Amino acid sequence: QIFNFKQGSYVLIQGCGPIGLLLLTAVRTMGVRNIIAVDGDEKRLAMAKKLGAAYTANFMTEDAIAKVMDITGGKGAEMAFQCTGSPKAASTVWKYVRRGGSMCELGFFVDNGPTEYNPHLDICNKEIKVIGSWTYQAKDWIQACDMLKEAQKDGLPVEELLTIEQETLHEAPVHIDLSVLIDFRSGQ
């Protein structure tokens, strides 16, 4: 909501784990079609494509920065989301953002150590807007569920994001914390 995406904008999502893939799904339901997914795992990039990423870049097998610049006509993405929790990735995300663009860091929920970047070259010289995301409000859950329902209506395979079978939930030890499973087919 904060970034007010426009038609034709390039939005980059770095990190295609659960957070990045759910974010990709949300951005797609907001009408963004030029989504670039960056990760080092081909399975995750394949899932990103299924969920609506127009482009993917595998930093393990190609120069992802050069590929993103090629995709965006040498400018970079208007918006980049850093979803990895990796200090090394956090130092790279700036290279994907165009002058006057924005970057949202939402991948660090634990202290994974410091990262290195150049405030002059990476932020100030490019006039990048930076925001961190830590938590959410209760109303955000409703909006998130609505976005997932919308994604399902659009034919995006959000159910494939689940990595555990429903039956397995009943077999799990009581002392293990599990994510909440929501069945959108019920309409509630």
Describe the function of each predicted region:
Residues V97-R99:
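Helix-to-beta-strand junctions that scaffold the AdoMet/dcAdoMet cofactor pocket
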Residues S9, G101-S102:
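Glycine-centered, small-residue-biased loops immediately flanking beta-strands
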Residues I13-C16, R28-T92:
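Adenosine-nucleotide cofactor-binding segment
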Residues Q1-R33:
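Short internal alpha-helix immediately C-terminal to a glycine-rich phosphate-binding loop
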Residues D41, F109, Y136:
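Residues in the short beta-alpha loop(s) of Rossmann-like NAD(P)-binding domains
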Residues F108-E127, A144-D146:
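Rossmann-fold NAD(P)-binding glycine/threonine-rich loop
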Residues S91-K95, Q137-Q188:
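C-terminal hydrophobic helical "lid"/dimerization subdomain
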Residues G85, G107-F108:
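Short glycine-/small-residue-rich Rossmann-like dinucleotide-binding loops
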